Amino acid sequence: MDGRTADSPLITAYRGGKPTRRPVWFMRQAGRSLPEYLKVREGVAMLDSCLRPELASEITLQPVRRHDVDAAIFFSDIVIPLKLAGVGVDIVPGVGPVLDKPVRTAEDVAALPQLTWEALEPIREAVRLTVAQLGKTPLIGFAGAPFTLAAYMVEGKPSRDHLGPRTMMHADPETWNALANWAADASGMFLRAQLEAGASAGQLFDSWAGSLGLADYKRFVAPASARALDHVRHLGAPLIHFGTGTSELLVAMRDVGVDVVGVDYRLPLDEANRRLGGTVPLQGNIDPALLSAPWAVLEAHVREVIKAGSFAPGHVLNLGHGVPPETDPDVLTRVVELIHSISPE
């Protein structure tokens, strides 16, 4: 944990304190919405851009320079730990992560290569380069949650309903647990590499957990998510847990042992806080769809989100999902200016 960021608005809010200004950052703030990103990425494959430390660092820094957000989020991809372990995976444009061979049997899981600490050196180097330039602005490390990683591995590609992993949990729980634990250790090591190299907080993204009911989540997923975070708890950095479509899972997601819960755009923050019993700071949850609405509509919505978030023990503004690629970057800058102009309670 970088001592220079301890008093930053972001870390203060994550710890339930009173920040000097309202902190805001955006999921997917680094990436396709920025012309400068498209320029440096030209001719470079997605996963290659994540593994070139200078390039990954530059992409991470771009939105901080442009928008004056209160945090950088490390530019990478949730399947990078798979690639670094030696699993055949690539990002296919217009599709997403595609594996050379799905993982569907006990033999498949037993044959998975193990991620090594040495393989993570490009990640550590990119983080070191980034924090050296960020100064007092915190860098958030991130990793995909084990369920989301394992879901990709079972399906072999993105899926709408995740029937494969959901069937495996019940049909072959032993194999499922072995796979979830493999994914937990890969994710946990990936996050640990970022935090040890200087990231100030860590976020676990469970993109696909919304396909699960609460009982399945608690039984088949939560233990693996807790295991992933066990790799980094000793470092003392604030930990955030976010999933999409997870309104019914928020309490269980908190209970894997995190400091902050991210809320997607579907659930108002005052209701999320009520469900969580006012126990943790919240992050979110501006609706990305409204970034393309008239400014008066977007401004009213942002103010509404701030009001709903004021009920929680702490609030970091964010979107309720990632920045859509077609977003006008000037709108994001204007949203940041608006949030910073509203004095903290």
Curated annotation (Swiss-Prot):
GO terms for biological process: protoporphyrinogen IX biosynthetic process. Substrate binds at residues 28-32, 77, 152, 207, 321. Coiled coil: none annotated. One of its GO terms (molecular function) is uroporphyrinogen decarboxylase activity. Its main location: cytoplasm. It comes from the Bacteria. Keywords: Cytoplasm, Decarboxylase, Lyase, Porphyrin biosynthesis. HAMAP family: URO_D. This is Uroporphyrinogen decarboxylase. It comes from Arthrobacter sp. (strain FB24). The gene is hemE.
